[in-house]
């Protein structure tokens, strides 16, 4: 289901109750690769954004994962849920383009995505579709 338009749908994803306690449970059980995907200041590591791969392995994400696979991956291509999180306001990604379509769902907090000079605000339950090869940057307005 390929779409070449950036689309933001407000409140359309039924997300689980999620907070930083739930995040620690996911980190503790998923065994997914984790990293700081952007440059950071050595003395302020906790102000960075963090990335956790394969979050779909945790039961809290099974219903979202199954729904996304049914709606957006009809050919069963390799896919995953990647969590991006930050403990402080202002964490951001580098501007980048992905080689595949990206669907971002708001789980916790507020994030602004800058895409083609436009700002898209994503909060809990929102779904943002970013077509492949589209340059975008996420900026956390609150911890997320």
Residue ranges of each PLM-predicted region?
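An N-terminal JmjN-like helical accessory module and its immediate linker preceding a catalytic domain
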Residues: 1-26
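Proline-centered helix-kink/hinge sites
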Residues: 12, 131-132
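Active-site region of the double-stranded beta-helix
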Residues: 28-127, 134-144
């Amino acid at each position: 289901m390929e779409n070449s338009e950036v689309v933001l749908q407000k409140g359309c994803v039924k997300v689980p109750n999620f907070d930083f306690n739930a995040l620690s449970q996911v980190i503790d059980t998923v065994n997914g690769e984790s990293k700081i995907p952007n440059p950071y200041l050595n003395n302020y590591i906790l102000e960075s954004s963090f990335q956790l791969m394969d979050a779909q392995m945790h039961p809290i994400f099974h219903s979202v994962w199954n729904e996304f696979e049914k709606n957006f991956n009809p050919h069963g291509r390799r896919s995953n849920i990647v969590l991006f999180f930050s403990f402080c306001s202002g964490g951001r990604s580098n501007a980048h383009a992905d080689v595949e379509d990206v669907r971002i769902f708001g789980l916790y907090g507020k994030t602004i995505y800058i895409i083609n000079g436009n700002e898209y605000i994503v909060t809990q339950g929102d779904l943002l579709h970013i077509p492949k090869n589209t340059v975008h940057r996420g900026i956390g307005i609150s911890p997320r």
